[in-house]
């Protein structure tokens, strides 16, 4: 997609009404187009308004991208002649910007060669690549059981404290190492504290350099919980625009959205103020369209790919709620983080039975990978079914066959753990990026009983099977 040209400044209007985040502006001359950005100054600060509706002959209804406190009727507003334009390119790496592309990390101005409009059309059918490829992450449990599609969309489900952020950071790190790709993180309705923690953790784990520049691998775009709904409804698009630029440069980009539910929630807040009649559970009537317009832009083209990992909050654990239900329709894979696995000390705490992927198909991953993954899942499923018997009667009451299955399942569980690069700081063990062939080979040997003689402890927090064998020798010698 071509870079947008520098817009011509259009007509000047005046504020006629302010209702929270919605501002009406009257123009005497030409009316600005829908989605155009209007600018005014509010208490000495640049305030951007986005045109949402045309009312009558000379009035437009707009959504404010920042607080509208202090705005008065009669105040001058100018049309920029284009949608919101944000800086894109390598200069954005390691920096934090807001919905309108202004840096908010106190590391100086953000000057880039290109700016790009946040509203873009999805790539045409001709531009899209239809080839099904998996994106190897170097994380065993993901690559084996719920592989990510290159240019696919992954839903990341998990409560507080089970390791969503660490998994996100490891993915950023591994994609940069294995594919030389960049990442973009969009914090949508995030807690400011969490956003700040993520920024500093990225610097500590060498994902980014302080103040951006050479060596940084991720660009951050934040619209926190305290921002008006206009900013939260558009910040995901700002992040996506930065990611699209990298994709069009031929990169494999990882695009993180935390949290996709807040994008919908912000849209519903704005919708009511715009006078739209709400639909089911009070959501905006345009829910599916808003979600579809954003999700369709996340795709693989013939030049590069955007692979999106979206954290999804499920209100009241109700998966039939319109917001998560609309998100599910777009997902290619789900990675479910489980508290019960985290409690066993197994990290990443990915649930091997609940996580799914449409890429786990013999036509895509090959017969061997598919067979090994299914055997691993059936062994773990059998262990899960036997757990009640073990808890009541103990291991001795099981048949010999079941005892072997349980022993293998426990080894598989431990072998699904692995040390992360970004966790080196607090675990003290060096991170491991495991090649897909090594992952398949290791688990194939495990389910076929080749490693039944090795102790359970040898499989915990190692990378490849060779390391597990080495660890077993050390344990035997100790």
Curated annotation (Swiss-Prot):
Which Pfam families does the protein's record reference? ATP-synt_ab, ATP-synt_ab_N, ATP-synt_VA_C
Question: Which reaction equation describes what this protein catalyses?
Answer: ATP + H2O + 4 H(+)(in) = ADP + phosphate + 5 H(+)(out)
Task: Cite a GO CC annotation.
Answer: plasma membrane
The record's keywords, sorted A to Z, are:
ATP synthesis, ATP-binding, Cell inner membrane, Cell membrane, CF(1), Hydrogen ion transport, Ion transport, Membrane, Nucleotide-binding, Translocase, Transport
What InterPro entries does the database record attribute to this sequence? AAA+_ATPase, ATP-synt_VA_C, ATP_synth_F1_bsu, ATPase_a/bsu_AS, ATPase_alpha/beta_chains, ATPase_F1/V1/A1_a/bsu_N, ATPase_F1/V1/A1_a/bsu_N_sf, ATPase_F1/V1/A1_a/bsu_nucl-bd
Q: At which positions is ATP bound? A: 158-165
Question: Which principal EC class is assigned to this enzyme?
Answer: translocase
Checking CDD domains in the record gives: ATP-synt_F1_beta_C, ATP-synt_F1_beta_N, F1-ATPase_beta_CD
| Recorded topology in the membrane | Peripheral membrane protein
EC number(s) per entry: 7.1.2.2
Task: List GO molecular-function terms, semicolon-separated.
Answer: ATP binding; ATP hydrolysis activity; proton-transporting ATP synthase activity, rotational mechanism
Localization: Cell inner membrane
From the record, what ranges are coiled-coil? none
In which family does this protein belong, per the annotation? Belongs to the ATPase alpha/beta chains family.
State whether it acts alone or in a complex, and with which partners, per the record.
F-type ATPases have 2 components, CF(1) - the catalytic core - and CF(0) - the membrane proton channel. CF(1) has five subunits: alpha(3), beta(3), gamma(1), delta(1), epsilon(1). CF(0) has three main subunits: a(1), b(2) and c(9-12). The alpha and beta chains form an alternating ring which encloses part of the gamma chain. CF(1) is attached to CF(0) by a central stalk formed by the gamma and epsilon chains, while a peripheral stalk is formed by the delta and b chains.
Protein name stated in the entry: ATP synthase subunit beta
Q: Which organism is it from?
A: Rhizobium leguminosarum bv. trifolii (strain WSM2304)
């Amino acid at each position: 997609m071509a870079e947008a040209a520098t817009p011509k400044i259009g007509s000047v209007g005046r504020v006629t009404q302010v209702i929270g985040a919605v501002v009406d502006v009257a123009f005497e001359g030409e009316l600005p187009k829908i989605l155009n950005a209007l600018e005014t100054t509010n208490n000495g600060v640049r305030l951007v308004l986005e045109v949402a509706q045309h009312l009558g002959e000379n009035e437009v209804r707009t959504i404010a991208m920042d607080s509208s406190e202090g705005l008065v009727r009669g105040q001058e507003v100018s049309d920029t002649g284009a949608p919101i334009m944000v800086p894109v390119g390598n200069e954005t790496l390691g920096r934090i910007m807001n919905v309108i592309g202004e840096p908010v990390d106190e590391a100086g101005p953000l000057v880039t060669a290109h700016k790009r409009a946040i509203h873009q059309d999805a790539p045409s059918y001709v531009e899209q690549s239809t080839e099904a490829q998996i994106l190897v992450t170097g994380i065993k449990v993901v690559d084996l059981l719920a592989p990510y599609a290159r240019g696919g969309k992954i839903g990341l489900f998990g409560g507080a404290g089970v390791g969503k952020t660490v998994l996100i950071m490891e993915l950023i790190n591994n994609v940069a190492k294995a594919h030389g790709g960049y990442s973009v993180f969009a914090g949508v309705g995030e807690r400011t504290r969490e956003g700040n923690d993520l920024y500093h953790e990225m610097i500590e784990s060498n994902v980014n350099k302080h103040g951006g520049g050479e060596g940084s691998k991720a660009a951050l775009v934040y619209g926190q919980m305290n921002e008006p709904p206009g900013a939260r409804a558009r910040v995901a698009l700002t992040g996506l625009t930065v990611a699209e630029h990298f994709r069009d440069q031929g990169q494999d980009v990882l695009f993180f959205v935390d949290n996709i539910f807040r994008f919908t929630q912000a849209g519903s807040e704005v919708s009511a103020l715009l006078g739209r009649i709400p639909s089911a559970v009070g959501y905006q009537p345009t829910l599916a369209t808003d979600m579809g317009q954003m999700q369709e832009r996340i795709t693989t083209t013939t030049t590069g790919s955007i692979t999106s990992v979206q954290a999804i909050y499920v209100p009241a654990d109700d998966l039939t709620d319109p917001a998560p239900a609309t998100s599910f329709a777009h997902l290619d894979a789900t990675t479910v983080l489980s508290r019960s696995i985290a409690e066993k000390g197994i990290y990443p705490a990915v649930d091997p039975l609940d996580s799914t992927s449409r890429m786990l198909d013999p036509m895509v991953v090959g017969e061997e990978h598919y067979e090994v993954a299914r055997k691993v899942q059936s062994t773990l499923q059998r262990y899960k079914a036997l757990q009640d018997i073990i808890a009541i009667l103990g291991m001795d009451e099981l048949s010999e066959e079941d005892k072997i299955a349980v022993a293998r399942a426990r080894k598989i569980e431990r072998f699904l753990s692995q040390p992360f690069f970004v966790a080196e700081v607090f675990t003290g063990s060096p991170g491991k990026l495991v090649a897909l062939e090594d992952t398949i080979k290791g688990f194939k040997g495990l389910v076929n009983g080749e490693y039944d003689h090795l102790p359970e402890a040898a499989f915990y927090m190692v990378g490849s099977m060779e390391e597990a064998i080495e660890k077993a020798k050390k344990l035997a010698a100790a």
